[in-house]
């Protein structure tokens, strides 16, 4: 099977996909995101050190359009597991269709926080802080907040205060802050 992982939770997604495939007895080809390939290289070194037989776990690096599309269309690959964007998920599904391979997609959701009039007084603050987990770079981050009209003005004030109190610093520094986003493209998406 082909395992195609995202940049925003690289080691988490690599571990989840590889462990599931290994337990099922599958051989696998892992293609990590080109934005965060070093986690997968480290994981490959750990697999080798653990004594996995040659050919059971395989790592290829490259971009989605080039390498990912080749994996999803390859006739010797029976399944593709992909976590990432809806756009890429559609392309993988179309590419995989010609070989009738199974496709597993996790395309995120960006669910909403619902804040009703009787909600806990910390609901808005908690919701904003959940968005900031992983520097806000999560497919499941609740980036929308739907607030009952009677709490709206208060919620806007609380959300702004909470967001303005979040500090950005080096990812390697200790303390309570968020790190930088992965690249300029993602930073621009946040600004837009």
Predicted feature descriptions by range:
Residues 73, 79, 87-192:
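ALDH superfamily catalytic-core signature
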Residues 2-123, 175:
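Rossmann-like NAD(P) dinucleotide-binding subdomain of oxidoreductase/dehydrogenase enzymes
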């Amino acid at each position: 099977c082909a395992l195609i992982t995202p940049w925003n939770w690289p080691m988490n997604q690599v571990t989840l996909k590889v462990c599931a495939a290994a337990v099922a007895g599958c051989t696998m080809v892992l293609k990590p995101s080109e934005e965060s390939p070093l986690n997968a290289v480290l994981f490959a070194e750990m697999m080798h050190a653990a004594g996995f037989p040659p050919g059971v776990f395989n790592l290829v690096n490259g971009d989605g359009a080039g390498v990912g599309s080749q994996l999803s269309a390859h006739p010797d690959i029976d399944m593709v597991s992909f976590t990432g964007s809806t756009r890429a998920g559609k392309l993988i599904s179309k590419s995989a269709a010609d070989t009738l391979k199974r496709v597993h997609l996790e395309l995120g959701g960006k669910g909403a926080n619902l804040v009703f009039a009787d909600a806990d007084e910390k609901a808005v603050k908690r919701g904003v802080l959940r968005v900031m987990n992983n520097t806000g770079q999560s497919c499941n981050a609740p980036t929308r907040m739907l607030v009952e009209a009677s709490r709206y003005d208060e919620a806007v004030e609380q959300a702004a205060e909470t967001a303005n109190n979040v500090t950005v610093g080096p990812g390697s520094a200790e303390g309570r802050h968020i790190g930088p986003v992965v690249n300029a493209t993602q930073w621009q998406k946040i600004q837009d």
